């Protein structure tokens, strides 16, 4: 896969703890995350697949891959953005996620959009 300036995707993330869906006594901590994918390049591109690495506070790692996001493979023209919200369940009060999207420009060039690590944490538990 290539990475070049004409194919540039920016990814911004916010996450929150969902107390009403969690069960602390059972070690079930539910988090929602909202992702903004922005095409900062100068060519249209489609999100083809996602690759996640999810790590809990005990160091347990789970890998998740799949086509598109939330059942879609959005195509973004330059200057366009796509937002979606999804969720993850951890067995600990803290963790992190990171990964990348496989993208394809309209000319068939494949490239990667990096998803930088972000924290999942129950409020008032981050050390």
Curated annotation (Swiss-Prot):
It holds the Pfam family DUF525. GO terms for biological process: error-free translesion synthesis. HAMAP family: ApaG. Gene3D superfamilies: ApaG domain (2.60.40.1470). This is Protein ApaG. Residues 3-127 form the ApaG domain. It comes from the Bacteria. The lineage of its organism: Bacteria, Pseudomonadati, Pseudomonadota, Gammaproteobacteria, Lysobacterales. PROSITE patterns: APAG (PS51087). The gene is apaG.
């Amino acid at each position: 896969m290539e990475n070049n300036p004409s194919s540039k995707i920016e990814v911004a993330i916010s996450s929150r703890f969902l107390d009403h869906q969690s069960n602390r006594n059972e070690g079930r901590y539910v988090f929602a995350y909202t992702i903004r994918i922005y095409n900062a390049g100068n060519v249209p591109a489609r999100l083809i697949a996602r690759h996640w690495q999810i790590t809990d506070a005990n160091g347990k790692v789970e890998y998740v891959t799949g086509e598109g996001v939330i059942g879609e493979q959005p195509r973004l023209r330059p200057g366009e953005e796509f937002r979606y919200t999804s969720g993850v369940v951890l067995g600990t009060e803290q963790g992190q996620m990171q990964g990348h999207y496989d993208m394809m420009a309209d000319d068939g060039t494949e490239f990667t959009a990096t998803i930088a690590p972000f924290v999942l944490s129950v409020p008032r538990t981050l050390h």
